[in-house]
Structure formats: structure tokens, C-alpha cells
Amino acid sequence: MLPAKFKTPSQKSLNRRMASIPDGLVRRCPVCHTTFLTDHWEPTRLCPACGYGFRLTAMQRIKLTMDTFQETNAQLTVPDRYTDAAYQAKVARGRQLTGLNESVLTGFGTIDHQSTAIGVMDAFFVMGSLGTATGEKITRLFDEATAKRLPVILFTASGGARMQEGIHSLMQMAKVSAAVARHSQAGLLYIVVLCDPTTGGVTASFAMQGDLILAEPHALVGFAGRRVIEQTIHQTPPADFQRAETVLQHGFIDAIVARPQLKQRLADLLRLHKGES
């Protein structure tokens, strides 16, 4: 019998090796299913094969987009009347992950010397859901932008209305829509950027009310979830169902812009609206 050249490692040795591998070193794209190393993917966090943009926190998005930024209404958070322990745990987890008090970051700043109001919904905070304070922050953003005669850019990323807050959450759809209307009646520009995912009550209201509606490549955009639709119509939708490319083909959005080009495209659109070349 030949002597063994290789020795089977012990479980203890394997555990030590696993512990030395950093978290997030390898990712798998949910769109094209490519597996890749993440050593060079910051700050844009794109799939190298298909260009799908992995989810960003609101602050990461601000750093990619804005040259200057001043946050507003940072203190607004979930009202005290919602005392459910499981819900409070989700909110606490969202605060830990994002550093925010709610699922949207709002403020004012500049993009390539163009002044604008900006809001960024954060999918890492209770799935970017539309809660009472979320709606209040976005409403204040639009009203403050109207008073200052500034455009609004809103990045949407949301699972929809926050069911834990019931009718108060649903009311935010109408409340924000009214603020959008006041801003529009003042002749001001509203640009929406649909990020992955934009669904539910957010899609059914202010996400589709922009003067210009952009989307990131392969972003999930829809109202009801795929599983709910399959159970309702008893059919299997196509693989690209509710992806930004399909939504563009059906005329619901104006353009798909890759993440590396998005900042310059927004700056160009702001200039065009001001009548600058």
C-alpha cells in the first residue's frame, strides 16, 4: 500500500480556516447568477458580468451622487405609539445597519455645482418601507424644496407600505403625493431614480409621479410581489418580469442609467431644466 501524501484536515483545522475568511468576500448576482470576488467592487458595488447594482445604504448613495450634502429632519423616527416588540426590534436593527432613524435620508446639496433637494430610501432599514415618519420626512423635503425653489431628486428602494403601522402608513401615499403636486404646480423639477427594489405603495404613488423617471439596470420595479401574482393568476411570469428593462419597454420609465454614469446624468438634467447648456 502506498503511503498517503495528503492528510485529511481535522474539523478543528477547517473551522480555523473558515474563521479567517472575511465576510462578503464572494457574491452571487441575483440576476445573471455570476459568482465573483468583491475585492474591487467598491464604491459602486456592481456585478462585473451584467452590471446589476447591489443595494447601497442611503449614505453610500449620497457619497456616490452628491458633492456637498446637508441632512435635514434627521431626528424624525417611528412614533412612540407603535409598541410591538417584534416591530421595535426590526427598527432597532435598521438603525444599527444604516445609522438612520428612519428608512429615508433627506437633505440639500449640490451635484456638479447644481443645487438640489435629495431623498434616498434605504432598503436596509425595515426594507425601505413607507412608515409614518418616512412619509413626513419626504413631505417636508418637497415642501422645503418648493419654498426654496429647488428641484427634488428621490432615489426609491422600498418593499412598500409598512404593514406594522397600518392605515397611518397607507396615508403617507396620499400625503407625499400632495406635496409632490404642490412642488409641480410651482413649476419645479422632480426626478425619480428607481433602485432595486421599488414595489408596493411607493410604486403606486410618488415613485411614478416624477417629471423624469430613471432606473438602475435590472432593478425590480412593480406593485405586488412575484409570488402573489403567480398565486393570483395561476401562471408563471417571464424571468425578466418586473425588471427595469421590461418596464422601460412598456413605457413606464424614461431611461435606464448605469450607476457609474448616474451622477453626471443627473447633473446634466438639472442644467437642462435651468436652461443652461
Swiss-Prot record:
It catalyses: N(6)-carboxybiotinyl-L-lysyl-[protein] + acetyl-CoA = N(6)-biotinyl-L-lysyl-[protein] + malonyl-CoA. Its cofactor is Zn(2+). It comes from the Bacteria. One of its GO terms (molecular function) is zinc ion binding. Disulfide bonds: none annotated. This is Acetyl-coenzyme A carboxylase carboxyl transferase subunit beta. Keywords: ATP-binding, Cytoplasm, Fatty acid biosynthesis, Fatty acid metabolism, Lipid biosynthesis, Lipid metabolism, Metal-binding, Nucleotide-binding, Transferase, Zinc, Zinc-finger. Residues 25-277 form the CoA carboxyltransferase N-terminal domain. A zinc finger (C4-type) spans 29-50. Its EC number is 2.1.3.15. It comes from Levilactobacillus brevis (strain ATCC 367 / BCRC 12310 / CIP 105137 / JCM 1170 / LMG 11437 / NCIMB 947 / NCTC 947). Belongs to the AccD/PCCB family. It holds the Pfam family Carboxyl_trans. It is an enzyme of class 2 (transferase). Component of the acetyl coenzyme A carboxylase (ACC) complex. Biotin carboxylase (BC) catalyzes the carboxylation of biotin on its carrier protein (BCCP) and then the CO(2) group is transferred by the transcarboxylase to acetyl-CoA to form malonyl-CoA. The keyword Lipid biosynthesis applies. Binds 1 zinc ion per subunit. It is found in: Cytoplasm. One of its GO terms (cellular component) is acetyl-CoA carboxylase complex. One of its GO terms (biological process) is fatty acid biosynthetic process. Pathway: Lipid metabolism; malonyl-CoA biosynthesis; malonyl-CoA from acetyl-CoA: step 1/1. Acetyl-CoA carboxylase is a heterohexamer composed of biotin carboxyl carrier protein (AccB), biotin carboxylase (AccC) and two subunits each of ACCase subunit alpha (AccA) and ACCase subunit beta (AccD). Zn(2+) binds at C29, C32, C47, C50.
